[in-house]
């Protein structure tokens, strides 16, 4: 079983690429980590609709932040989209955006648990994530927290992944054989 991390910027094609990686797999579950679409944000609704329209009808879908549980219980391939919204959801669920120390503890605990589950995964798992480390350093504490925590999360997942693909402007770079930073 393989774990693949697909990382890229907004609208880079990373989700399409992740979906293509498992397109020939008979049993796929799409794991959406973003906030459910309640129709209150038309732009978000359009993004969700675009993602749904692209997926094969045979795929099952689940909306959850409980990634460890899903990974440990899966017999078929998983596409997790995406780790950035997962991290945001964890901090939202903890109500900790104003308590970044507590938020950091929650994220570290969940990151460790996720990486352990991925290391022991019994099915193919493709995870989509945002590359935010190439952007400007945010001016707000919560923005810097998010950027730093997502960078740490991405590095942890990349360390246990069999494959790492960077998607930039619709092009895929395979980083799977690139050395890890010690």
Residue ranges and their predicted role:
Residues 2-73:
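Conserved P-loop
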Residues 5, 79, 126-128:
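Structural motif
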Residues 18, 51, 79, 130, ...:
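Residue-level signal for inorganic ion chemistry
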Residues 28, 78, 164-166:
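Short, well-ordered beta-strand core segments
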Residues 33, 82, 129:
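Short, conserved active-site loops that position catalytic residues or coordinate cofactors/metal ions
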Residues 35-36, 85, 133-135:
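A short, flexible beta-alpha/helix-coil linker loop
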Residues 54-94, 98-110, 118-119:
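Portal/gating segments that form or line small-molecule/metal binding sites
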């Amino acid at each position: 079983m393989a774990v693949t991390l697909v990382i890229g910027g907004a609208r880079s094609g990373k989700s399409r690429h992740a979906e293509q990686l498992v397109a020939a797999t008979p049993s796929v579950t799409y794991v959406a980590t973003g906030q459910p679409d309640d129709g209150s944000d038309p732009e978000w609704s359009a993004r969700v609709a675009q993602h749904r329209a692209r997926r094969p009808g045979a795929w099952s879908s689940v909306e959850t932040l409980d990634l460890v549980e899903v990974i440990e219980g899966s017999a078929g391939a998983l596409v997790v989209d995406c780790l950035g919204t997962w991290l945001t959801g964890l901090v939202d669920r903890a109500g900790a955006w104003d308590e970044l120390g507590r938020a950091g503890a929650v994220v570290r605990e969940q990151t460790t648990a996720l990486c352990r589950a991925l290391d022991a995964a019994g099915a193919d798992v493709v995870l989509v994530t945002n590359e935010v480390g190439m952007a400007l350093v945010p001016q707000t504490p919560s923005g810097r927290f998010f950027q730093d925590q997502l960078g740490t999360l991405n590095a942890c997942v990349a360390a246990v992944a069999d494959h790492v693909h960077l998607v930039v402007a619709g092009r895929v770079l395979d980083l799977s054989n690139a050395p890890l930073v010690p």
